[in-house]
Amino acid sequence: RLMDCTLRDGANVVGKGFDAEITKIVLDILTESNVPIIEFGNAGGIGAYEVAGFTNALTDMEYLDLVQPYLGKSEIGMFLNAKRFREPNVELAASKGMKFLRCGADAGDARKISEVPVKTIKKCGMKAYYSAMKAYLLTPEELAEEAKFLESIGLDEFTIMDSAGTMMPDDVKRATECCKNAVKIPVAFHCHNNLGLSAANAIAAYESGADILDCGLMGMARSAGNLPTEAAVAFMQKYGEFKDIDLYAMLNGIDQRLLPAMEKHSYHDAIPPYDLILGVSGAHSSFGKTFNAVAKDTG
């Protein structure tokens, strides 16, 4: 499965959160193209606006009100940094229809700070997902033990997060295999592109049994960015996966709505929709003039 993090991790591109216009555009694109899981809100997670002063964003209540028309179209939830846990924020998310909160803490800190947040999320009737941030701080075996502990207290999903984009495909393979062998809950992988390996690492995770891949439209995320959602859909469909996701609806939405909206933020899309289609189809870019002429002739 695929979890799109554009509206959470991608919000780092513009500050700590997208404005209402772009938030709605992204929600439209993701739900209309059948993306199954969406993480949204303040880049620092629910509560970060007040607790951490991440005010370059809408408030949590504004995001939660804005998302109401989209509930039921995808599984929608928010991030929760374990260090910023406040029970009323978890209760608020549940009351506003969130399907999950993804608790996050640095790898190795789960026993110290994550037990109460995870149990509170479950108590409030939501799924408890987890991000082991900076997963490379632990050996694969240590990471697997942390996943086992979290599973034992009710966790529903465990994410291996390559926060600095430093992991190599072999690192991803070992970490994913260890975690998959240790737990029965789904294991996800969240890559960053600092070494240009986001796609290679996502494929390594998939081939090693990962159940969920994190990504963001146009690669939007902190630092060097994430795995582009549209690229993930394109290459995973070559593996016979993500068949229910409408790649062309997604690309049209990016081309016609999201790219123009992001011009005010001077965001550069490294793999524009046209170039992605060339990769999907195996057509060399030198055929561009012919494609355009045929398109013009056929309307």
Language-model features: locations:
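Catalytic cores and adjacent flexible loops of soluble metabolic enzymes
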Residues: 1-299
